Amino acid sequence: MITVNVDLGDRAYPIHIGAGLIGRTELFAPHINGSSVTIVTNTTVDPLYGDALRAALAPLGKRVSTVVLPDGEAYKNWETLNLIFDGLLTERADRKTTLIALGGGVIGDMTGFAAACYMRGVPFIQVPTTLLSQVDSSVGGKTGINHPLGKNMIGAFYQPQAVVADIGALATLPDRELAAGIAEVIKTGAIADAEFFDWIEANVDALNRREPAVLVHAVKRSCEIKASVVAADEREGGLRAILNFGHTFGHAIEAGLGYGEWLHGEAVGCGMVMAGDLSVRLGLLDEASRQRLDAVIAAARLPVSGPALGEARYMDLMRVDKKAEAGAIKFILLKRFGDTLIAPAPDEAVFATLAKTTR
């Protein structure tokens, strides 16, 4: 097992990475101080890993309940969030009740938001079961739900007590979900660590094959990078925004098609292709680097062309982006691998990128 620490002073927490971790009682015990625990999971994950987690919690002598939600991005909304609150109130959960998010990014985001809101804040633990949630969404305290007009527009910054990333859970992950997670690994290397990007290029086929040692390194390095960014800029006042490379275009794709039509990582992968093209058009990134970026995204079996929503629709959707100011869209742009710029772009350049990268 490898442990990466997120250094946030008295709110610091560990990220445990390895195989077989869901069943290890000692990873959960230090972070559960009340008399009850509520596991929040979904209809896909609970049959796979719910019993193992409940067995790990049994020696602690806590009252354990489970809220099982429908699976999918389409359910990341107020109605589903209320199912968590219904479960907590039915069980008479109190301020010391610990929530455990067992699932992918949707479960983690909603459980964290529920934890931030219930009784104005209760502790929670992330147990991410997808690659995307292990390398990205479970770390950093971003929680929330979608709105029909924009992704993740309603939420809170609320840090977990711990993250338990069990690599063994990736064995049951569908290929599309694996590729979606690799997209976030690629993003992390592209924005923050050129050497890590080189490693991803050399190992993308091994990632596709789910080789355990390669997966462990991908999760470890991605978490190290994200932890350092979050420690420096917890609430996205500046530096942390670089983690949204590919997300401005990607969120527009998700909202434009309807949440769940494309996986989040698929939209981010395609969004990176778009952002790379825009970076070249603005004279920031060289063409050879853009081609390398596109090639590794394609090798990860991710889409490299966006849906033809129309230029006006893309622009409207991107103006709802959280980075936008007074209606001006800000993009995360690449200067070279490991070096980014956050800036607006002329509409003509964005239109040209959309014309080239959508079908």
Swiss-Prot record:
One of its GO terms (molecular function) is nucleotide binding. Its main location: cytoplasm. Pathway: Metabolic intermediate biosynthesis; chorismate biosynthesis; chorismate from D-erythrose 4-phosphate and phosphoenolpyruvate: step 2/7. It comes from Burkholderia vietnamiensis (strain G4 / LMG 22486) (Burkholderia cepacia (strain R1808)). NAD(+) binds at residues 71-76, 105-109, 129-130, 142, 151. The keyword NADP does not apply. Zn(2+) binds at E184, H247, H264. This is 3-dehydroquinate synthase. Binds 1 divalent metal cation per subunit. Can use either Co(2+) or Zn(2+). The lineage of its organism: Bacteria, Pseudomonadati, Pseudomonadota, Betaproteobacteria, Burkholderiales. Its cofactor is Co(2+); Zn(2+); NAD(+). Belongs to the sugar phosphate cyclases superfamily. Dehydroquinate synthase family.
